Amino acid sequence: SIETENNAVARRTFRLLRDVFDVQPELVTLRRSRLGGRNAYRVEISGSEASFVLEGCGIEVGQRRGVPREITVRKCCRMSFLRGVFLACGSVTDPEKEYHLEFVLEDESFAAALQRLIARFSLNAHVAKRRSMTLVYLKGQSEITDMLSIFGAQSARFAMEDAYIRKELRNNANRAVNCDS
């Protein structure tokens, strides 16, 4: 099964499984009372169909976790992989408040591999623990906008840059007013 809080990712996963692998997935909505009451979505397939899909993706059952070597060879594959991981478990805070992009992961070794993959784009990602989860995160505005470009999210990048400019103009105006008084 694949679980996500992003409805669009769940629907896309459902369609890809059905159309590419000709399996019959089930889409389950999980209602959550905690974590802000946000729903989660689980796409499920049977055991034999799951083995078929994993084999079709080149994933061996019981294989160690990490970034598949084939992904790291070409830049376009690295970019697509990062985009997919972000859609599955990433978030960006409101740039009007702070600059923070994170991936929330269960597996520490995958988090370390993801950090190394991000470093190949000359970005400095950090790793931290939050309860039982491992975070890979970026803090700076320029690093986050660069990462959004890697994802191919140009409109989000421009929105973040606009927010940064507005914030800087407000701060400069406040400094000028404070200096005059």
Model feature map: region roles:
Residues 1-160:
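DNA-contacting interfaces and partner/effector-binding or oligomerization modules
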Residues 146, 150-181:
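Extended mid-to-C-terminal alpha-helical interaction segments
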